[in-house]
Amino acid sequence: MAMNISNFFIKNIQKSIKFSRQYAKSTHPFTKTWSLINEEIKSGFKQQTDYPQHADVVIIGGGFIGSSVAYWLKTRAGEGLSVAVIEKDTAYEMSQNINSHGFITQHYSLPENIYLSQYSAEFLRNVKTHLNENVDIEYSPHGTLILASEKYAHKLEENVALQREYGVKNKILTGEEIQKMYPWLKTSDIKLGCISAESEGVFNAHNLLKGLILKSKELGTTYVKSEVIGFEMESQRDVLMEGVKPGSFNRINRLLYRTEDNEEISLRFAVCVVAAGTDSTHIAELANIGRGSDLLTVPLPVEKRTYNVYSIENEANKMSIGLNTPYIMDTSGLWLRRNGIQNNLICGLVPPLKVTDIPDSDIFHSSLHNRYPGCGESKIQTISTEYSDCNTYDDTGILGPHPYHTNMIFATGFSRQGVHHSPAIGKGVAELIIDCQYSTIDLSRFGFDRILIDEPLIEFNVY
């Protein structure tokens, strides 16, 4: 089903882009070697002196999704579209520790998520063609094993049947079969499992991020190390919009950002993409979303979730973790995967949708010792603390224009899926801006409207 986007949205996007054509010429050509750029990303961008005041599209957030949007916009439109990315953390400290994010799977119950995985897997396999020959994301294809208890076995079977309809090649296993394949796992409380081997695997997420940034800059995207502090609006009393009092509409057309020198600059734009991860709700509030009336009463329900990633060293127990060990998702929310060619595992818990009084470490250790009893003699240590942008409404990403600020497009709340789905999400946003509709994958159900009318879009998985 094709996405229905209002004529108001289409006309305003086209009109605004035409109006904003006169923009500052500020680009960052690809002139440094890969190693030098690598160090630049780690330490932050050089002091910026030329700050843009105009852009056709401004993207708030230069992480995986934001940089993917920039990449696809410039790939399709080239010099015909000016793109600026505002990122306050150009050292990407929030993205340095992303050990749990570098995986891709098709084990979903929503067709959109299956399609996002399939498209992104193809992008990752051909990343050197898309980005640069120097980009090495260390992609390692292997299967994902989903474990389901008696309670969730029926749901797993339903998911498997759906996935096969969309071309996913998978196989249902009994607990006994899983035990024979992976004797170090305890499966007495596992009813069924499902393993698949195509278009799934692990990769170096940080190298993917670097590659997206470098290519976006090479194509002409301007990255600005600054913090967004507000929006400017202009009254458009002639605009009539359902759910908005006549004569009260105010359109956002500028954002304010603060530079490293504490200078405040106003940037005029046609379209604003909010891909700010855990900061997205704050950005939305700056546009009065969640603080206004009528269509602005409902806030953006994206919150920060913090969780730990652990390493299990296996020298003590002599248990061999085979090289063919898949990425394992347990029914408890525990995940485990082999750490490259080393005989050890990295693991953690899927961040909960709702915060509870039970410490995550208690849940983790209980789940780990239940599924992997042999870890008792192993050294378990925390290797990183990571973050995700959790949509607390239904735990599914929010994508598309806001119903009031129709030139503000959200691309946030995807949690851990945001990394491996970022190539496809970025392409979808670029299609919205350039074509005013989704062309590759219909992602219209991910829109903000579902929150307004209280129709959650839930990914029914077994963990």
Q: Which sequence ranges carry the predicted segments?
A:
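Extreme N-terminal leader/targeting segments of oxidoreductases
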Residues: 2-56, 72-81
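Active-site substrate-recognition segment that forms the wall
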Residues: 71-72, 102-104, 126, 134-143, ...
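Flavin (FAD/FMN) cofactor-binding and adjacent substrate-gating region
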Residues: 8-9, 30, 126, 148-226, ...
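Core beta-strand elements of the Rossmann-like FAD/NAD(P) dinucleotide-binding domain
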Residues: 53-55, 261-271
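Glycine-rich FAD pyrophosphate-binding loop
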Residues: 74-97
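Glycine-rich Rossmann-fold phosphate-binding loop(s) that bind the pyrophosphate
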Residues: 61-63, 67
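Dinucleotide-binding Rossmann-like beta1-alpha1 core, especially the glycine-rich loop
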Residues: 101-181, 333
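Flavin (FAD/FMN) cofactor-binding core of flavoprotein oxidoreductases
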Residues: 164, 176-180, 202, 303, ...
